[in-house]
């Protein structure tokens, strides 16, 4: 299992977001050891069922938009490889802690004959370092997890046995941020990019990702 975002998994995460308090606390997202996420379920994208594929894409990008704009802080414990949508999930979170290891982080879409669509481009441009935008998004460069801080995928990298401990400490610290002050500041910061992300989601088609 590589933690792919299938329609079922996207729905499960979306249901979880519905249940998390939006006026207090914080949220910690953790992947399985060795793999944070490898992105969308390619079997669905390549199944020939365009409606199912589009629904998966739109719901997946909507999920990222919700995480990105969530009223409370979200911390990611990146436990391994974070590829494609997995890397963009990191971009959606407010603080990202990575585990040392032989892991890669990055967006490999252009190296796999796929397009990085508008919602993801807008999210990534907002979170990734400007001097890495060409390398990360257009060149499809993959970064070792220990080199993923400079481009903006991660905020710190720690020993594997300390990952959850340090991520939890950070989540508890961010949970003390006052409501609604954190949320309202985030809204002001993200106002323009959220409009672009959500507008792009409405226009998503399979050919916008995988042109014939």
Sequence positions of predicted segments:
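Conserved CoA-thioester-binding segment of acyl-CoA-metabolizing enzymes
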Residues: 1-30
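Catalytic-core regions built around general acid/base machinery
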Residues: 16-19, 59-71
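CoA-thioester-processing core
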Residues: 83-136, 170
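Short, active-site-adjacent cap segments at secondary-structure transitions
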Residues: 34-37, 82-84, 192
């Amino acid at each position: 299992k590589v933690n792919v975002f299938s329609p079922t998994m996207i729905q499960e995460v979306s249901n979880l977001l519905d249940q998390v308090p939006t006026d207090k606390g914080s949220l910690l997202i953790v992947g399985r050891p060795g793999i944070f996420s490898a992105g969308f379920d390619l079997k669905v994208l390549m199944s020939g069922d365009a409606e199912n594929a589009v629904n998966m894409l739109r719901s997946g990008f909507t999920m990222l938009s919700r995480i990105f704009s969530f009223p409370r802080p979200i911390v990611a414990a990146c436990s391994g490889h974070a590829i494609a949508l997995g890397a963009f999930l990191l971009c959606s979170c407010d603080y990202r802690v990575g585990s040392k290891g032989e892991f890669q982080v990055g967006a490999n879409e252009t190296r796999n004959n796929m397009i990085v669509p508008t919602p993801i481009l807008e999210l990534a441009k907002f979170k990734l370092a400007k001097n890495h935008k060409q390398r990360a998004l257009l060149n499809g460069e993959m970064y070792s997890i220990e080199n993923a801080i400079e481009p903006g995928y991660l905020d710190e990298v720690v020993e594997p046995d300390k990952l959850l401990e340090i991520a939890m400490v950070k989540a508890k610290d961010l949970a003390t941020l006052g409501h609604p002050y954190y949320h309202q500041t985030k809204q002001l910061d993200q106002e323009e990019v959220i409009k672009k992300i959500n507008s792009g989601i409405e226009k998503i088609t399979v050919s916008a990702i995988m042109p014939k």
